[in-house]
Curated annotation (Swiss-Prot):
In plastids the F-type ATPase is also known as CF(1)CF(0). One of its GO terms (molecular function) is ATP binding. The chain crosses the membrane at residues 27-49. F(1)F(0) ATP synthase produces ATP from ADP in the presence of a proton or sodium gradient. F-type ATPases consist of two structural domains, F(1) containing the extramembraneous catalytic core and F(0) containing the membrane proton channel, linked together by a central stalk and a peripheral stalk. During catalysis, ATP synthesis in the catalytic domain of F(1) is coupled via a rotary mechanism of the central stalk subunits to proton translocation. It comes from Spinacia oleracea. Keywords: ATP synthesis, ATP-binding, CF(0), Chloroplast, Hydrogen ion transport, Ion transport, Membrane, Nucleotide-binding, Plastid, Thylakoid, Transmembrane, Transmembrane helix, Transport. F-type ATPases have 2 components, F(1) - the catalytic core - and F(0) - the membrane proton channel. F(1) has five subunits: alpha(3), beta(3), gamma(1), delta(1), epsilon(1). F(0) has four main subunits: a(1), b(1), b'(1) and c(10-14). The alpha and beta chains form an alternating ring which encloses part of the gamma chain. F(1) is attached to F(0) by a central stalk formed by the gamma and epsilon chains, while a peripheral stalk is formed by the delta, b and b' chains. This is ATP synthase subunit b, chloroplastic. Its main location: plastid. Belongs to the ATPase B chain family.
Amino acid sequence: MKNVTDSFVFLGHWPSAGSFGFNTDILATNLINLSVVLGVLIFFGKGVLSDLLDNRKQRILNTIRNSEELRGKAIEQLEKARARLKKVEMDADQFRVNGYSEIEREKMNLINSTYKTLEQFENYKNETIQFEQQKAINQVRQRVFQQALQGALGTLNSCLNNELHLRTINANIGMFGAMNEITD
């Protein structure tokens, strides 16, 4: 009876260094598997993730540059509009008697259309930046999930085979049979 109890105690502990045995502690086994999977993901995924983020950063920076160029063009148009405004104001002084209200209305329309154009360029820039950022985040999430899944499947496939399953099942059947003998 003592030998049977000693064999169960031996099966419940980690095997000593240099020997082979089964770890029946499911919680400890899962922690080891998780730490191995996370280590592999961090080791292999770091380079791919940084390359992906660098590429995305370059695209966003290019988009920002393009938006800044558009903004510069809008400012240039604004300056041209201001020059035209000055000209219109000079003409207004000359034609004040004939139609001051008409010139004032034209001036306001010109200013409003210029500011609307500038606001549209600014909104376009902000929407483009926000879209590119969200797209980058979604792609990174998808890439990390795919790599994690591939790594986990690879680890599981490399660790589990038919012989290991059969030996584990046989060991558990033997332990169950020994437990039935003890209770009988």
